[in-house]
Amino acid sequence: MTSPSSITVPDEAAAHKTLYEKGLKIRYEVAGPAYVDAALAGGSSTFARPMQELVTEACWGSVWARPGLERKQRSLLNIAMLCALNRGPELAAHVRGAVNNGASEVEIRETLLQAAIYCGMPAGIEGFKIAEKVIRTMNEEKKQ
């Protein structure tokens, strides 16, 4: 087994590249091209790019790629946490991702109800507004 201190710089660069590529694939599959492209474009400056790289590698390339939870379960967990944190734009993206991962409207609604009880009604109400708008938009997109 290799310890972190024994990894050489080329090995580290290769590991980052592998995680980034895996993460980018998962990120596109879950969040969709429009959201990912906008996030990457918004993080394309020299200052902001490292944050997008970290999100893609650590979040999507590492945690989302782990065994043990299905993508739908991860999406529902994110919905609950983002509702509790009152992170509207990210919540909207993850509601869309949950639908893309096979979550039903009922599962999303029940997740938000559960979150509302534990994180507070104002956060839950806001979460419902955001989720309903996303679901409505996605249903309209299907009709077109």
Which positions does each model-derived feature cover?
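Amphipathic alpha-helical interface surfaces
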Residues: 51, 73, 90-94
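Short alpha-helical scaffolding segments that buttress acidic/His motifs in well-ordered protein cores
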Residues: 55-59, 76-83, 111-116
